[in-house]
């Protein structure tokens, strides 16, 4: 082969490798609970992420490059979350959708911020997460400081109980919400008889039930997740208590109904709106159902919106810092509607709703 032919061949090879590089997948870490007591919320997250990525890639991906999900399990455990965050760093991934629980998201976010990795959490609601001046942390859900007052307002204006107990699981998410509700109720001069914590993972709540009965409690707000809430409901009803219960989106899971059975009927919950009921989202709902998955979970939609937000940013830059700046300065159309963020990375104008939970695992607007 002559020199000219060799040069032409080399050029073709270089072009081929260049095109291969352009077609490389963009890896996105999706981190949540795949194991442990709240793995059902991880199921919601991964359902939303997988559908979002499938839809984004079907429409051309990011400038011709496809998104690729890399799943990580932190079990909503802070120590595991740190290990996962370090694994994400070692794997060279620059974008994270997750984590879910506030207690695991916060320590992981320290690592991501230090390493220049963008994190968009679809579920962590603790205000402390974005109150530390970090630049690379955003969320597609609201805050405890939004959800707590929503619950308190409904309790004061609609339920009007006489004797209230506030119970929490002593974790960042649950206790934070419980305190936010307590603050709102105190402002309304409600009679909060006691504020106390239980141990996450506990299954025998006979002592708590006896206390509710002794104190003539007619309303209980619980800050925490569905495994304990389900047991408390079941045991309270078995003891003959007619007490009204309320909890956050952390209890709004079909597994709650599996635990509590008919005792779950009438539970009040605060959570994001039912995005699966939005007409424009029907094609996504149908696609998820076709895979025998459940589209009703709140985190399905906040995760889908997180991927849409990342997509919008990646269409501008592949630099995590530039993506964060873009999102904080622009509105993004998502399955949740248009999303805008403040300088801290919190959504502007996010609203929680109040719903009646039913024994069949569905939720309807509370009256």
Curated annotation (Swiss-Prot):
Q: Which GO terms describe its cellular component?
A: ATP-binding cassette (ABC) transporter complex, substrate-binding subunit-containing; membrane; outer membrane-bounded periplasmic space
The domain of life is: Bacteria
- Tell me the compartments it is located in: Periplasm
Please state which protein family the record places this protein in.
Belongs to the leucine-binding protein family.
Q: Does the keyword Signal apply?
A: yes
Protein's recorded name: Leu/Ile/Val-binding protein
Gene name linked to the record: livJ
Predominant location category: periplasm
| This protein's record includes keyword Signal | yes
Q: Which UniProt keywords apply?
A: Amino-acid transport, Disulfide bond, Periplasm, Signal, Transport
The role this protein plays is: This protein is a component of the leucine, isoleucine, valine, (threonine) transport system, which is one of the two periplasmic binding protein-dependent transport systems of the high-affinity transport of the branched-chain amino acids.
- The secretion signal range is 1-23
InterPro entries (alphabetical): Leu-bd, Leu_Ile_Val-bd, Peripla_BP_I
Q: List the disulfide bonds.
A: 76-101
One BP annotation, GO: L-leucine transport
- Which residues does UniProt call coiled coil? none
Q: Pfam families, per this entry?
A: Peripla_BP_6
């Amino acid at each position: 082969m002559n020199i000219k032919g060799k040069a032409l061949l080399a050029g073709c090879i270089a072009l081929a490798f260049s095109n291969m590089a352009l077609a490389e997948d963009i890896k996105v870490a999706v981190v949540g609970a795949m194991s442990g007591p709240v793995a059902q919320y991880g199921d919601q997250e991964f359902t939303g992420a997988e559908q979002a990525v499938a839809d984004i890639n079907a429409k051309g991906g990011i400038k011709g490059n496809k998104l690729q999900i890399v799943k990580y399990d932190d079990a909503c455990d802070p120590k595991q979350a740190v290990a996962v965050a370090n694994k994400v760093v070692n794997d060279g991934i620059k974008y994270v959708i997750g984590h879910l629980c506030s207690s695991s998201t916060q320590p992981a976010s320290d690592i991501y911020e230090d390493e220049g990795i963008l994190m968009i959490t679809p579920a962590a609601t603790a205000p402390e997460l974005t109150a530390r001046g970090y630049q690379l942390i955003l969320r597609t859900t609201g805050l405890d400081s939004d959800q707590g007052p929503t619950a308190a307002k409904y309790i004061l204006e609609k339920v009007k109980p006489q004797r209230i107990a506030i119970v929490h699981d002593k974790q960042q998410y649950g206790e934070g919400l419980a305190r936010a509700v307590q603050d709102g109720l105190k402002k309304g001069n409600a009679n909060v008889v006691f504020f106390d914590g239980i141990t996450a993972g506990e299954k025998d709540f006979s002592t708590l039930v006896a206390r509710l009965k002794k104190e003539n409690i007619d309303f209980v707000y619980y800050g925490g997740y569905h495994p304990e809430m389900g047991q408390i409901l079941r045991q309270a009803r078995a003891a003959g208590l007619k007490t009204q219960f309320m909890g956050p989106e952390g209890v709004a899971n079909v597994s709650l109904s599996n635990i509590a059975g008919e005792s779950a009927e009438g539970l009040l919950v605060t959570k994001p709106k039912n995005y699966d009921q939005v007409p424009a989202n029907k094609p996504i709902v149908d696609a998820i159902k076709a895979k025998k998955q459940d589209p009703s979970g709140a985190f399905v939609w906040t995760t889908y919106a997180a991927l849409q937000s990342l997509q919008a940013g990646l269409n501008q830059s592949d630099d995590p810092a530039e993506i964060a700046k873009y999102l904080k300065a622009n509105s993004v159309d998502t399955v949740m509607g248009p999303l805008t963020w403040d300088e801290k990375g919190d959504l502007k104008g996010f609203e929680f709703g109040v719903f009646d939970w039913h024994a069949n695992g569905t939720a309807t607007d509370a009256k």
